[in-house]
């Protein structure tokens, strides 16, 4: 019997919109997690039967969910089951808890003199987050129990902080079912250390940890995030924690809580190099490569590609570029900063304000340094994937300076796509620093002067060294492709 794999995530591999004629038009989902899971599933698909469970995010998605009648649409050959969660429940769970509380927590983003304020409104929102996770747990249990029986081999892969309660809730629904149903949870974010984690209300913080420990395996991109999770389990829950796992080399610890053993593992996500390079040869990307080359006019290019996300640290990156032009005037007229950003989470007030600050600061830098024959900075805030690939291809320097990041795929994709070798200026607070740090220029993301100095060092780096470093970075990114990343998650459930 083929292995059955159930994937659960907030955003799925396909989303729908209504066309002009009222028809439903599907579009492949974006984002690093989605791309990684799709690519990984493609590699294991011949040996597995997969169903992907996700939330309906739009009115069109909800129409599809109702039309499905518990069936599934398909994307990339994967059956997709969308959950029609009430819009107000979804909004509170996604925007008020997942993004405004848990995301801020793990990225250490709270403005603590003012926020957060966990009052009655948050308690209402938390009940919605619980209901949202219950909807996923119920759907996963339905799918799993439909297969339960002799010979059934079912693996559940729960993705990210939106679904931190789902593993425990699923366990409750599987009580008495086949012991061949095993559950994994993977966090694509960092994890907060215990002292910061205690910002959450005590019962909420314990519920999140307890929920994740309903899984047989809990995974992270970097060992430091796994270590912080173990610290929280020990400090907040009083769970029994060991730092040497009983599994494979990717196991960094285990937690015994409520009679269950959970392995804590590390699986860094790299890049599907053949697919990425093939996409970069498409006509739309090549057109952008030519256009960016004309815009550069022979000047050096410092490139960044981000979402307008608070943790991506775009404002300090712009400040570092301004300091470079101020302290190293020899670069005026000889370098251009391409800052390409994707709009992100406009429903969250802090994100709207941050995007406006990015736009304003870019305007100030342009006005301060512009010359008749030179525009020092090109900022575009819109979704344009081909343009982003092209920017990575032509970069002399790639700036990736998040204040905190679970992994960061751009830091890996840039060297893979580079056509002339690029120097990588990388935050030490990105999970990717653990694998790329030897060949990148590591910086403190809060230190604008250090970042400016690293940009200068990258610009003057000898071509041979730049190419050597870029090739080494690309090789590292290729060493953990999505197929291996997802396969390792499945393997961790067999121990």
Regions found by a protein language model. Give the residues of each.
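Catalytic cores of carbohydrate-active enzymes across secretory and cytosolic contexts
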Residues: 1-495
